[in-house]
């Protein structure tokens, strides 16, 4: 099955960003063209635009674009997620301890896929060292869309945080990250806690480092 932006593997941080930026610019340009070319009745404008097809097979189509058409709302969702993904990759690339690391897998459009993670990073010896799930959630409610539960499951932390030498992150919006990491949450028996790290990017993307509840001193 084709995706709006196809997965790719075995690439360095720089090349990954170049590919994603090109695909992102294309999606934005096609979405804008759809809006400009629309002529919907004002009384049904919102529902019509939301479902309006965006043509993805016109113009200079980047190699990562896998679909020929997609609903406007889904194109917007993927564009926002890719913006978070690019912020996350830039942040990982800037960390001194990640020098020489590269991307084993990148899945820009395959959210909630239990077969892998949105971003998998390896070290110079080809060992997996980082797993990351990426989302752009417009909510300050930790239970929004059950997204956290899905990401935690995909990262293998729903029962315990594996002590396998792999660091695990959720890359998301500031408002959602703050809700997830809040010490005021009803943590109960959750086996994990978060360390919230701001990327200092212009879009307020945050990284949530997942830690074992047994080892974390921040929050209860």
Model-derived regions: residue spans:
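Domain-level recognition of nuclease-like catalytic cores that cleave nucleotide substrates
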Residues: 170-220
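Acidic-basic catalytic patches of nuclease active cores, encompassing PD-(D/E)XK
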Residues: 57-107
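Conserved catalytic cores of phosphodiester-cleaving nucleases, focusing on short active-site segments
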Residues: 119-141
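Nuclease-adjacent, charged terminal/linker segments that flank catalytic cores
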Residues: 1-56
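Mixed-charge (Asp/Glu-Lys/Arg
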Residues: 1-24, 134, 157, 175-187, ...
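Catalytic cores of nucleic-acid endonucleases
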Residues: 134-191
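Hydrophobic, Leu/Ile/Phe/Ala-enriched alpha-helical segments that form helix-helix packing faces
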Residues: 27, 88-97, 155-159, 183-187
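Active-site metal-binding core of divalent-cation-utilizing nuclease and nuclease-like domains
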Residues: 101-125
């Amino acid at each position: 099955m084709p995706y709006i932006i196809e997965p790719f593997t075995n690439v360095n941080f720089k090349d990954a960003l170049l590919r994603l930026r090109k695909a992102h610019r294309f999606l934005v340009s096609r979405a804008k063209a759809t809006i400009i070319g629309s002529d919907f009745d004002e009384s049904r404008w919102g529902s019509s635009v939301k479902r309006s097809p965006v043509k993805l097979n016109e113009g200079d189509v980047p190699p990562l674009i896998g679909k020929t058409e997609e609903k406007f709302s889904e194109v917007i969702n993927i564009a926002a997620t890719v913006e978070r993904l690019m912020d996350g990759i830039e942040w990982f690339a800037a960390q001194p301890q990640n020098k020489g690391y590269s991307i084993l897998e990148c899945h820009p459009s395959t959210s909630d896929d239990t077969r892998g993670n949105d971003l998998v990073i390896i070290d110079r010896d080809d060992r997996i060292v980082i797993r990351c799930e990426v989302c752009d959630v417009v909510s300050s409610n930790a239970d929004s869309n059950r997204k956290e539960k899905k990401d935690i499951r995909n990262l293998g932390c729903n029962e315990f945080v594996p002590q396998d030498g792999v660091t695990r992150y959720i890359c998301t919006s500031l408002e959602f990250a703050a809700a997830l990491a809040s010490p005021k949450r009803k943590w109960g028996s959750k086996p994990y806690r978060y360390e919230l790290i701001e990327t200092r990017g212009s879009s307020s993307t945050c990284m949530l480092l997942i830690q074992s509840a047994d080892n974390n001193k921040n929050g209860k």
